[in-house]
Amino acid sequence: MARGGAGAEEASLRSNALSWLACGLLALLANAWIILSISAKQQKHKPLELLLCFLAGTHILMAAVPLTTFAVVQLRRQASSDYDWNESICKVFVSTYYTLALATCFTVASLSYHRMWMVRWPVNYRLSNAKKQALHAVMGIWMVSFILSTLPSIGWHNNGERYYARGCQFIVSKIGLGFGVCFSLLLLGGIVMGLVCVAITFYQTLWARPRRARQARRVGGGGGTKAGGPGALGTRPAFEVPAIVVEDARGKRRSSLDGSESAKTSLQVTNLVSAIVFLYDSLTGVPILVVSFFSLKSDSAPPWMVLAVLWCSMAQTLLLPSFIWSCERYRADVRTVWEQCVAIMSEEDGDDDGGCDDYAEGRVCKVRFDANGATGPGSRDPAQVKLLPGRHMLFPPLERVHYLQVPLSRRLSHDETNIFSTPREPGSFLHKWSSSDDIRVLPAQSRALGGPPEYLGQRHRLEDEEDEEEAEGGGLASLRQFLESGVLGSGGGPPRGPGFFREEITTFIDETPLPSPTASPGHSPRRPRPLGLSPRRLSLGSPESRAVGLPLGLSAGRRCSLTGGEESARAWGGSWGPGNPIFPQLTL
């Protein structure tokens, strides 16, 4: 009877081997088509699309490696009675199958979690770099799945009767009790997490959001029309997250946040994710969990368990492409997929700076700016300007898109001063040029500090030049002229060398108003200075600072800004040094 049972088992497995091979090839092509279709339809890969592509890639590996290996071995055994499983092939099959089974379970759970997060907390989802978190989640999923599934191949199995001794018995009860329990618990956790997240998503979509919309309409009907007219906030059916494009002071886009989806798109994506979760739970998760439980309970692996596990794994790889194809958002025709294949082969889509992104159901084209916030010299020719579609992000609807200007000093500096409080010109490059390496001293006599005569003479000449420039067009004219025409060259000519005096930079800093109330005062008309009371600005750490007697530790240490009043300078008349400071109290 044992031989007859073994013969029936072998016959059932061999009769299904050809079907597994054909279905595996079809699943491989279908999932590859889905990946190309998603890539072609969505120019900007969002976390949800990335997880769908990873799930399709996992199914490709499932159909290509373990299922195809099992089918080929069964066909070889059918063709030759001497051929059988060996230890290496069986270990590779078991490791790859359980790695991909766990990776599929966790990827589906992560997909449902991201959808719940996006629907329930839309603002937090867009501000939390969900794409990076999705990539990290996929890396963790594959690492955990691979480590756990590789342990049976390196010794974590039943040593009494090894699973690769007679054939390849890959059901968890034949591998070992410890592995079977760990695998079943992880599988159960992934299934429960996916179902809970889908339930919260459906509740938020079908009940919570319509209830808030009714409350908003009720509030808008009471007083919203008086407050804001037809476009008041109270008359909106629900809260919408605006699309945000973040740019720096140079006009270059640094990052962007997508706005709220339309009701149709949101419902389509929610239905797709829910269908994928229920598909996996009904065809793969629950059947494999039931088989594992009964096999561990009875410590046996009858043929129906092997057939059920293999066919359930094959069915999910075939049905996932059909589910994604049913969603209009990710459905692409043959021409679009072919163009995507050509672009991938020619590596035309590798440069992200020249591409276009999809925001607010329109197209946005990135425009590169120079240091002044204007387009480069080559784009001044009207013949080189390309026409954009009628609906794009350069002129977006005001309630849908917001543009933010984030200067470089705000992103890269530790200074927490609110630089947005002071209005600036859009083309201004130096929104804030820190003067932390300068020192301003107003002595009673310019020669009292013991400065070198060469420097003092140069200083007087520079002050006379500054007075002449300010009389002509303002003290900031030379620096702004350098920024506006010195970089690109005036009139399109070659740029002049950056021959820029330090005193001009210091004057620009001191005459530029800062937003902080405790900062230096803003630009004011220059008052006539008494003879000998010319401001002198030295750098902490320069040879001039050591010549006038600054402490060595201060000049070699942290740079700071020191400002002294005119009264303190008049009250002090002697020499000064480390033990006799010029100012009674200084803040570093």
Swiss-Prot record:
Modified residues (Phosphoserine): S413, S435
InterPro entries: GCR_153/162, GPCR_Rhodpsn, GPCR_Rhodpsn_7TM, GPR162
Extracellular side: 1-17, 71-91, 155-174, 297-303
Annotated TM spans: 18-38, 50-70, 92-112, 134-154, 175-195, 276-296, 304-324
Membrane topology: Multi-pass membrane protein
Keywords from the named record: Cell membrane, G-protein coupled receptor, Glycoprotein, Membrane, Phosphoprotein, Receptor, Transducer, Transmembrane, Transmembrane helix
Subcellular location: Cell membrane
Glycosylation (residues): N86
Biased composition (Low complexity): 530-546
Region (Disordered): 445-474, 511-550
Main location per the UniProt record: membrane
Record topology, Cytoplasmic segments: 39-49, 113-133, 196-275, 325-588
Gene Ontology terms for molecular function: G protein-coupled receptor activity
GO cellular component terms attached to this protein's record: plasma membrane
Recorded family membership: Belongs to the G-protein coupled receptor 1 family.
PANTHER family: G-PROTEIN COUPLED RECEPTOR 153, 162 (PTHR16518), G-PROTEIN COUPLED RECEPTOR 162-RELATED (PTHR16518:SF6)
Described purpose of this protein according to its UniProt entry: Orphan receptor.
Name this protein carries in UniProt: Probable G-protein coupled receptor 162
Lineage: Eukaryota, Metazoa, Chordata, Craniata, Vertebrata
